[in-house]
């Protein structure tokens, strides 16, 4: 694996053809309209893309370590247990402490592409 990789991110967003997209499997709470692609990693950081269609949902989940999500395209809400929600839009960056339950809900007609990075060891442990 190379230490660096260029992903096209022009005016139309990330080139979806650079990755192998995998639909998220429903867990206890169903995910729908969501796909995940692993782009690779270097220096202990894994890079993933999450595609969330308008109205799509990524079910509530946790990551073992801190995770950072940059919203590349689209918008929606992050939801938490107890009903709390945070709205997000293109250009926002959201950080989650480890083991904080949260989920994603697409809100616009556009597809959301989010780039998420977190320690590679936590990705392997969760798999």
Tell what function each PLM region has.
Residues 82-99:
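Short acidic-glycine-tyrosine-enriched beta hairpin
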Residues 42-45, 53-56, 75-77, 120-123:
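Short, charged/polar surface micro-motifs in flexible loops or helix N-caps
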Residues 49, 72-73, 89-90:
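A cytosolic small-molecule/anion-sensing beta-strand core signal
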Residues 64-77, 81:
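Glycine- and acidic-residue-biased ligand/ion/polar-headgroup-sensing regions
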């Amino acid at each position: 694996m190379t230490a660096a990789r260029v992903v096209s991110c022009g005016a139309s967003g990330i080139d979806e053809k650079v990755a192998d997209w995998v639909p998220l499997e429903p867990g206890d709470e169903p995910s729908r309209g969501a796909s995940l692609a692993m782009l690779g990693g270097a220096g202990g950081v894994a890079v993933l893309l999450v595609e969330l269609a308008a109205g799509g949902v990524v079910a509530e989940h946790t990551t073992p370590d801190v995770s950072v999500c940059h919203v590349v395209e689209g918008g929606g809400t992050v939801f938490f247990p107890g009903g709390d929600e945070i709205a997000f839009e293109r250009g926002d960056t959201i950080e989650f402490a480890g083991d904080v339950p949260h989920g994603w809900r697409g809100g616009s007609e556009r597809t959301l592409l989010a780039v998420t990075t977190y320690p590679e060891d936590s990705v392997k442990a969760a798999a």
